[in-house]
UniProtKB/Swiss-Prot annotation:
Subunit details: Homotetramer. Forms an RuvA(8)-RuvB(12)-Holliday junction (HJ) complex. HJ DNA is sandwiched between 2 RuvA tetramers; dsDNA enters through RuvA and exits via RuvB. An RuvB hexamer assembles on each DNA strand where it exits the tetramer. Each RuvB hexamer is contacted by two RuvA subunits (via domain III) on 2 adjacent RuvB subunits; this complex drives branch migration. In the full resolvosome a probable DNA-RuvA(4)-RuvB(12)-RuvC(2) complex forms which resolves the HJ.
Taxon lineage: Bacteria, Bacillati, Bacillota, Clostridia, Lachnospirales
Region (Flexible linker): 144-155
Annotated SMART domains: HhH1
Descriptive protein name: Holliday junction branch migration complex subunit RuvA
Paired cysteines (S-S): none
Length: 207
């Protein structure tokens, strides 16, 4: 099994890249977001891969991080989700956002992904929820935030959400209710953690 391929980026197409290593060009299917995050052709890249073997075909699916690859592997373990469907899903949602959606029983967010209907969305939640732990999801998200630009608005919003959910869980609310309540708070980017927490608490009282 190939864990990753490190070599020269030879070609970039919308959903496929070619990486040359030791004189061999590897055709690798990637999420739609990956081409825009890659360096220029000719640069060295490291792509974490999954090899899908069929009777008449052998395909490589690649990701920029082990975390994304891990989420991909979890998705294809769900009955009815193949590599192409999993790749399509991760082209439209980050691994962290998908985890939060699963923990929050957010069927609407998951069924909005291409190729995923209501029944499949429910199946994803049922089959993956027991494999995810809230503290590990937060740790992963916060770790990525620390690596991001401290002035990044997206990073700041994620940290505020995480702080609010953690506070609600510490107050005795379930992770599902906490996630749903915080998600419903509007205009988070213009609010601090305390304000978001107060508004989320008001929503929980109405539940």
């Amino acid at each position: 099994m190939i864990s990753y391929i490190k070599g020269e980026l030879a070609e970039i197409l919308p959903d496929v890249i070619v990486v040359e290593a030791n004189g061999i060009g590897y055709n690798i299917y990637v999420p739609g977001s990956v081409p825009g995050e890659l360096p220029s052709v000719g640069s060295e890249v490291k792509i974490y891969t999954y090899m899908n073997v069929k009777e008449d075909e052998c395909s490589l699916f690649g990701f920029l991080t082990r975390d994304d690859l891990s989420m991909f592997k979890m998705l294809i373990c769900v009955n009815g989700i193949g590599p192409k469907a999993a790749l399509g899903a991760l082209s439209n949602i980050t691994a962290d956002d998908l985890r939060f959606a699963v923990l929050a029983d957010d069927v609407a967010a998951i069924k909005a992904l291409p190729g995923i209907g209501p029944k499949t969305a429910q199946k994803i939640i049922i089959e993956l929820k027991d494999k995810l732990k809230l503290d590990e999801v937060f740790e992963s998200a916060l770790s990525k935030n620390k690596k991001a630009d401290n002035n990044s608005n997206v990073s700041n919003v994620m940290m505020i959400r995480n702080d609010a959910v953690e506070a609600l869980v510490s107050l005795g609310y379930s992770s599902k209710d906490a996630l749903v309540a915080v998600k419903e708070v509007e205009d988070i980017e213009n609010k601090d953690s305390e304000t978001v927490l107060k508004e989320a608490l008001k929503k929980l009282v109405k539940f």
